[in-house]
Structure formats: structure tokens, C-alpha cells
């Protein structure tokens, strides 16, 4: 399996890159697409400083987990102060995982989900441990759906991918 994690300032640039890859490369033509997820960066509701790692210009990490999710029906009509407190608790639960970088993107009306998340870290264990810890926050009660999960190691040399293909 291969996951491609692309980002650009303009969505049309992503569409062009995807279409060019699928149409003009042998590798792209050979792949069977399983899933495509799309998100846009929008300012966070309560923390305008919460920016995706890729927007902050951070170097990509060695491991990534990407997944979509949708909040519960009552999340958006909940008292804003209560929602803010839940998000503060959620963020504080991640305090020991500063090396795990979050990329949170809005996906409303772009597919079947409301949000797209991508966590990057130096090791896969760090992502897994963080995701486990986040299960103990009250905000977790307000997640309706969060499947599928895709995880993988960053590969910078296409030869490495070709070497392991069946």
C-alpha cells in the first residue's frame, strides 16, 4: 500500500498533481486508488494559533497517521463555553506529545466527513500512544465516526517503494 500526503495553497494545484501523477507516471497508472481524503485549513474555533505543521513550515516527520472524523450531532449546538473547555482538556492531554505534530483540516462538504487529521511523529509508537491517551478525554464522547485510519512511514526515494512492491 502507498499513501500520498500532499498539500498546496490552492486545491486546484492538488487536483492537477493527482491527475498528472495518475495519468503520466507508470507508478501512478499501476496503482489502484482505495481512498482519497480532502481537507482545507480553516482557523480553529477557539485557538487561532493552532496551525497545521505543514503551514508552519515544519519538516515532515518519519511517520504519519491520517484519518477523517465527524463530530456528534450535539457538538455544534453545545454551549460554546462547554465546547471550549472540552477542547482545552483535549489539548492538555497531548501536552506530553509535543513531538507529535498535528495537521487538522476542515472537510465540511468536501466528502463524507467534517474533519481530516494527520499526525506526524518521529516514531509510530508516539502516534499510537497519543491516540490511546486521547481516548480518555471527554471530547471523545462527541465523535460520531473516525474511520478509516491510514498509517505509514515516510519514504523519500521512489526506488525504496519500487523495491518492496509485489
Where are these regions (language model features)?
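A cross-kingdom feature marking solvent-exposed beta-strand/loop segments within repeated
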Residues: 1-3, 98-103, 113, 135-138, ...
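Short S/T/G/P-rich N-terminal loop/turn motif that feeds into the first structured element of a domain
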Residues: 9-14, 32-96, 108-112, 122-132, ...
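Short, well-ordered alpha-helical segments in soluble proteins
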Residues: 25, 90, 94-98, 138
Amino acid at each position: 500500500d502507498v499513501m500520498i500526503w500532499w498539500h498546496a495553497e490552492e486545491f486546484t494545484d492538488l487536483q492537477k498533481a493527482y491527475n498528472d501523477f495518475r495519468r503520466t507516471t507508470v507508478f501512478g497508472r499501476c496503482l489502484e486508488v482505495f481512498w482519497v481524503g480532502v481537507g482545507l485549513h480553516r482557523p480553529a474555533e477557539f485557538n487561532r494559533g493552532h496551525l497545521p505543521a505543514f503551514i508552519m513550515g515544519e519538516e515532515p516527520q518519519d511517520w504519519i497517521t491520517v484519518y477523517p472524523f465527524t463530530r456528534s450531532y450535539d457538538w455544534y449546538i453545545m454551549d460554546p463555553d462547554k465546547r471550549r473547555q472540552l477542547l482545552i482538556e483535549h489539548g492538555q492531554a497531548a501536552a506530553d506529545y509535543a513531538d507529535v505534530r498535528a495537521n487538522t483540516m476542515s472537510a465540511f462538504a468536501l466528502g463524507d466527513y467534517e474533519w481530516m487529521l494527520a499526525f506526524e511523529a518521529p516514531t509510530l509508537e508516539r502516534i499510537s500512544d497519543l491516540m490511546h491517551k486521547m481516548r480518555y478525554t471527554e471530547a471523545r464522547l462527541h465523535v460520531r465516526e473516525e474511520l478509516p485510519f491510514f498509517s505509514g512511514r515516510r519514504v523519500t526515494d521512489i526506488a525504496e517503494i519500487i523495491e518492496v512492491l509485489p
